[in-house]
């Protein structure tokens, strides 16, 4: 790796990813050509056809009144990147797609903790997708580009950060896999990290992981592939580190040549040391007692009361610095919570480090829903609701991603009352979209195939109460609701949120000497406070046999691999416990709700699709109106027929089969037909859709001569007829059948006994 000046002021660094027999991928970072007025700008290329621009800018002055770091990450998908015109009414890009929002989150999560504490200048990172090979994904390239442009901008940033997707394909972890290669993968994960100096030399500190089993994982495992167990996932994290190191090195080399000098940005610490010492002196004892209260509401009420007392006692001393007092009180709370966990292995609600809160699960809680369930873990309460519909109700996706439709849609709602607060209610925020996507990824690997279950599925997770990991609660509630709706899942899935607390603890040896020891404590089923005050948020979902989804964010500069492996093992123990509780509520698919549509799949020849639809949809619309069934036809000839009752669906199927899969009537067959046309020489009678026969005028009079057909029959009349002859051209001659001579085999024209099966 080296940096080349490809023209004056334009520099390029290259990273080569060697995947052995799976080939190589080349990532190039170029700066100096585009977006020259941004603080830092990088054009990133993946091989030759993938190109995106990342630009980082900073405001000139800080937002002193902010008590948070104002970092904004935006991903702009340009449809010209794929040679397409947007499908919206105005034919231009509008609100960001779900893929773009999820990529924003992937970038934000490792970038945010890498800035200096107390920074209050607005920082904006804008990533624009300029060109995309349809066989590649842009999200991981965007992480690297955002890191590189930020590294060049002269900001107080402790990068660079490398991001890589690794997929387990044929037993090998492949970096930057193509969409085609991912179809053969059992597991893939996006891993971001940075280079650090470890005790044993240079290392890579993992900062963020977003991982999932693929949709066909069970079929691949049945075919002999390695299941993504906890051990395999831990190996994948280690396999990602060399690739991250290569990417970080390329970014750093580019920064060494082209980065602006780091500017002196003012920082605003949350509180001064004097404020902290004062708060600690007046609050430590009482706050320690308050943090042993088990119930969240009672504990919060007592800590709020203590905080008000501290503010009142220190009001005169620190007049005008009330925000600092509040921040110091929070910092003291964090210290006491962590201290108790590390020294006593007890948590603020009295549990041990591996204890799970009280669990409850029930199904069929919403009367008219197709499937519903209520899952509760402690004070976290999730209502899962499943809706089934025709496949044509699948989501249509207009984005740069490889998906164009989505049959399974998981929507997560987090109303403000779930935490006892007030707030805005409306369109989902990025957090809600991210949580819904995580729960969706956890469940996709166990969903039945379209052939086995021809439905579009919408799963909604309502977070009714929140105190730690509503996303993993959503996985559990969704599994229950899907089974209640009659969805034949391949295996039930449960999720659990883990946490990690670490610090240097003073320990005393046998000879009385004291030393500092780095201690890591992994927590099972973390509370909201433990999430906020801990060093790692680690969510794992899976079946009893393997992991289906994983999300990790850490604030540490490295977690020992044995600690991570232990956390995965601890998470599996918890997952198995939760699965047992869920199985007590429901352990196999229920009968489908009477309110859910019954969808039947049939196939018609592709060349018959036009006949089934008819001119301007005339035939299919008539079938829909007359039978009450909903019909959806795919390009390959698959027809989905849905109705809330069996007879309606069967009537529609019979009508479609009569057109597309007709069985020719035979001489001697009898029908109850409808007169559709009269002429001077006879009456045409409809036997089957698209199949008429003629009763000659000489046969209408029952042996008597008649002058005019209309004297005997009119259009719309029902006639019992028998096929007397079928000529070489397929024309059918009919004769009337006497009522008293009609045999039991007489069949309505819509469903002749010998013409359907």
Swiss-Prot record:
The keyword Nucleotidyltransferase applies. It is an enzyme of class 2 (transferase). It is found in: Cytoplasm. Keywords: Cytoplasm, Magnesium, Metal-binding, Nucleotidyltransferase, RNA-binding, Transferase. The keyword Metal-binding applies. One of its GO terms (biological process) is RNA processing. Its EC number is 2.7.7.8. Residues 668-737 form the S1 motif domain. Its cofactor is Mg(2+). It comes from the Bacteria. Its main location: cytoplasm. GO terms for cellular component: cytosol. GO terms for molecular function: 3'-5'-RNA exonuclease activity; magnesium ion binding; polyribonucleotide nucleotidyltransferase activity; RNA binding. Residues 597-656 form the KH domain. NCBIfam families: polynuc_phos (TIGR03591), pppGpp_PNP (TIGR02696), PRK11824.1 (NF008805). Involved in mRNA degradation. Catalyzes the phosphorolysis of single-stranded polyribonucleotides processively in the 3'- to 5'-direction. This is Polyribonucleotide nucleotidyltransferase. It comes from Mycolicibacterium paratuberculosis (strain ATCC BAA-968 / K-10). The gene is pnp.
């Amino acid at each position: 790796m080296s940096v080349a000046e490809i023209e004056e002021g334009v520099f390029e660094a290259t990273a080569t990813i060697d995947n052995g027999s799976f080939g190589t991928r080349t990532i190039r970072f170029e700066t100096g050509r585009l977006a020259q007025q941004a603080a830092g700008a990088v054009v990133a290329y993946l091989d030759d056809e993938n190109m995106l621009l990342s630009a980082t800018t900073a405001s000139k002055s800080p937002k002193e009144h902010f008590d948070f770091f104002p970092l904004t990450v935006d991903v702009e998908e340009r449809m010209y990147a794929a040679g397409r015109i947007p499908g919206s009414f105005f034919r231009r890009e509008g609100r960001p797609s779900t893929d773009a929002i999820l990529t924003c989150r992937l970038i934000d999560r490792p970038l945010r903790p890498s800035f200096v504490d107390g920074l209050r200048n607005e920082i904006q990172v804008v990533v624009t997708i300029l060109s995309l090979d349809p066989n590649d994904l842009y999200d991981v390239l965007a992480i690297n580009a955002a890191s590189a442009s930020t590294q060049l901008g002269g900001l107080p940033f402790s990068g660079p950060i490398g991001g890589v997707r690794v997929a387990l394909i044929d037993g090998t972890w492949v970096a930057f896999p193509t969409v085609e290669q991912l179809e053969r993968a059992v597991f893939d994960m996006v891993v971001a990290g940075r280079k650090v100096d470890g005790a044993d030399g240079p290392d890579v500190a993992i900062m963020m992981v977003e991982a999932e089993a693929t949709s066909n994982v069970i079929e691949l495992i049945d075919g002999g592939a390695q299941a993504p167990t906890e051990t395999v996932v831990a190996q994948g994290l280690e396999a990602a580190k060399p690739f991250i190191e290569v990417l970080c090195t390329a970014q750093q080399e580019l920064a060494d040549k082209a980065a602006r000098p780091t500017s002196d940005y003012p920082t605003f610490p949350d509180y001064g040391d004097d404020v902290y010492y004062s708060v600690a002196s007046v609050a430590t004892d009482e706050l320690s007692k308050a943090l042993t209260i088990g119930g969240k509401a009672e504990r919060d009420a007592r800590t709020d009361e203590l905080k008000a007392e501290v503010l009142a006692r220190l009001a005169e001393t620190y007049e005008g610095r009330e925000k600092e007092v509040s921040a110091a009180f929070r910092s003291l709370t964090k210290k006491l919570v962590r201290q108790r966990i590390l020294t006593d292995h007890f948590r603020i609600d009295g549990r041990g480090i591996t204890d799970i809160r009280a669990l409850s699960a029930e199904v069929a809680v919403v009367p008219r829903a197709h499937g519903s369930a209520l899952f509760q873990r402690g004070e976290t309460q999730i209502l899962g609701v499943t809706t089934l519909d025709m496949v044509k109700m699948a989501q249509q996706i207009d984005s740069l991603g490889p998906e164009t439709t989505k049959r399974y849609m998981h929507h997560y709602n987090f109303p403000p009352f779930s935490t006892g607060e007030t707030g805005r209610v409306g369109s989902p925020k990025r957090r809600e979209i991210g949580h819904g996507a995580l729960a969706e990824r956890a469940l996709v690997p166990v969903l039945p195939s379209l052939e086995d279950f021809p439905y579009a599925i919408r799963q909604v997770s309502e977070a009714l109460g929140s105190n730690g990991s509503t996303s993993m609660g959503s996985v559990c509630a969704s599994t229950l609701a899907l089974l209640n709706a009659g969805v034949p899942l391949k295996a039930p899935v449960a999720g659990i949120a883990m946490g990690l607390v670490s610090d240097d603890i003073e320990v005393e040896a046998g000879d009385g000497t004291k030393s500092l020891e780095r201690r890591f404590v992994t927590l099972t089923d973390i509370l909201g406070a433990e999430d906020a005050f801990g060093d790692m948020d680690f969510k794992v979902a899976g079946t009893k046999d393997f992991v289906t989804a994983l999300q990790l964010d850490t604030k540490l500069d490295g977690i020992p691999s044995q600690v991570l492996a232990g956390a995965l093992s601890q998470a599996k123990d918890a997952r198995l416990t939760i699965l047992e509780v869920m199985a007590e509520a429901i352990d196999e698919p229920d009968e489908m709700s009477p309110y859910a549509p019954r969808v039947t799949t049939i196939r018609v020849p592709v060349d018959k699709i036009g006949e089934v639809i008819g001119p301007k949809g005339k035939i299919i619309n008539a079938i829909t109106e007359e039978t009450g069934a909903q019909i959806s036809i795919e390009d390959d000839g698959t027809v989905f027929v849905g109705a809330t009752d069996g007879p309606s669906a069967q009537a529609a199927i019979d009508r479609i089969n009569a057109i597309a899969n007709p069985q020719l009537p035979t001489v001697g067959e009898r029908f109850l037909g409808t007169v559709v046309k009269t002429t001077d020489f006879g009456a045409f009678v409809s036997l089957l859709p698209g199949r008429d026969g003629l009763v000659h005028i000489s046969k209408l009079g029952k042996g008597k001569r008649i002058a005019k057909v209309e004297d005997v029959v009119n259009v719309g009349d029902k006639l019992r007829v028998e096929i007397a002859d079928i000529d070489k051209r397929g024309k059918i001659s009919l004769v009337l059948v006497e009522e008293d001579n009609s045999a039991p085999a007489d069949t309505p024209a819509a469903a002749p006994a010998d013409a359907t099966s």
